Amino acid sequence: MTKESLEKATFAGGCFWCMVKPFDTQPGIEKVVSGYTGGHTVNPTYKEVCSGTTGHTEAIEITFDPAIFPYEKLVEVYWQQTDPTDAAGQFVDRGDSYRPVIFCHNDEQKEIAEKSKAALDASGRFKKPIVTEIAKAETFYPAEEYHQDFYKKEKAHYEGYQVASGRAAFIDANWKG
């Protein structure tokens, strides 16, 4: 992996704690950073984003090598971590700061995301329409350090939250098997 070959991908899928591990454990991923994007406040804090006044959503920014793990595969992993039929948040996390968005860094990513969304919608996997937003990537602000790699630092809390939030059951019911 050389720095020149690396690209960025940005996904919002509810609580960013739950979005890191599924990507971080894939080959070709250099790093996954939890943060905030899509809003109007410069360098927002977690408290500000949760207040709903910044316009930002919790998101992750992935640095990846597309020769090892192409963007198409990242989008596939993304869908399998979210409820793409819920635009008002994800699982127990409600509101604009938890809305699902695929933030595209270029036209190629946008085309891939749009085709993937259309295919998922046409597949009939879900009874409701796929409402995940596809938007142009904006400035990404890394979250506070205690949010980074949460699944490694706070394993029991992370695993409990996956279950208590309803995310784990939804993923099992809709994506496993």
Swiss-Prot record:
Residues annotated as catalytic: 15
Any GO BP: protein modification process
Listed EC numbers: 1.8.4.11
InterPro entries: Met_Sox_Rdtase_MsrA_dom (IPR002569), Met_Sox_Rdtase_MsrA_sf (IPR036509)
Catalytic activity, reaction form: L-methionyl-[protein] + [thioredoxin]-disulfide + H2O = L-methionyl-(S)-S-oxide-[protein] + [thioredoxin]-dithiol; [thioredoxin]-disulfide + L-methionine + H2O = L-methionine (S)-S-oxide + [thioredoxin]-dithiol
GO MF annotation list: L-methionine:thioredoxin-disulfide S-oxidoreductase activity; peptide-methionine (S)-S-oxide reductase activity
One Pfam family per UniProt: PMSR
Keyword Oxidoreductase: yes
Entry keyword set: Oxidoreductase
Keyword field contains Oxidoreductase: yes
Family according to the record: Belongs to the MsrA Met sulfoxide reductase family.
Function: Has an important function as a repair enzyme for proteins that have been inactivated by oxidation. Catalyzes the reversible oxidation-reduction of methionine sulfoxide in proteins to methionine.
NCBIfam families found in the cross-reference section: msrA
Protein name from the UniProt record: Peptide methionine sulfoxide reductase MsrA
Organism: Listeria welshimeri serovar 6b (strain ATCC 35897 / DSM 20650 / CCUG 15529 / CIP 8149 / NCTC 11857 / SLCC 5334 / V8)
Biological classification of the source: Bacteria, Bacillati, Bacillota, Bacilli, Bacillales
Gene that this polypeptide is encoded by: msrA
